[in-house]
Amino acid sequence: LAVHLSMILSLRVGEILGLQPGDIDFDAADGRGTITVGRSLQRTEKAALEKTDPNQIYHIFPDQREGSSSALVLKKPKTKKSSRTLYLTRPLKEELLAWLEKLRQDELAMDGRYRNCGQLFRLPNGMPVAPEALSKWYRTWRAEHPEFEKIVFHGLRHSSATYQLIESGGNIKAVQGNTG
């Protein structure tokens, strides 16, 4: 799902991990559905957090790594234009619906031990997926699928923008709006 969000909607890793179920409106756009990007999840050094404008931070997640010098931080996106609402494709809408059902099943399976962090991307125990974990999972998947072009996760976003540029007949402004 994360790969599809990056390829189809040109989302950054932090934007993907910053998504919450409430950001999805399955009925919008005459039933086509939309997703609103308005947050980014980043791993930030604790020393840098002290210098960060508190108005930029929505939430600092509890430390899961003992003695860590960094924390997972849910904050405003990279730029003002990064906040945007995008249309879903039918397959992406169906995949998101299935994903939400999987999250419900994960919560039931944990029998009261689930810690719902509120994010769309969560570990089976309900805690948020860190950006470095998503990148590692993607690298592992890539190594298992040599038939696909070797590309880093962020490269999916660039490929998406290139595809959109071709499909739009070179309309740079339209692509800039989609990519934030």
Where are these regions (language model features)?
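Glycine-centered loop/turn positions within well-structured domains
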Residues: G14, G22, I35, E94, ...
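Basic, Lys/Arg- and aromatic-enriched nucleic-acid-binding interface segment
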Residues: L1-V13, L17-L19, A29-R32, K81-S83, ...
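Short, basic (Lys/Arg/His-rich) helix/loop patches that form interaction surfaces
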Residues: L9, L86, K102-G177
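Flexible loop/turn segments at secondary-structure boundaries
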Residues: R12-V13, T44-E45, E95, P128-V129, ...
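Charged catalytic carboxylate motif
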Residues: L1, P91, E95, A133, ...
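Short, intrinsically disordered, charge-balanced linker/junction segments flanking boundaries
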Residues: A2, V175-G180
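Active-site proximal loops enriched in glycine and acidic residues that flank catalytic Cys/His/Asp
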Residues: L5-M7, V13, Q20-P21, A28, ...
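Conserved tyrosine-mediated DNA breakage-rejoining catalytic core shared by Y-recombinases
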Residues: L19-E101
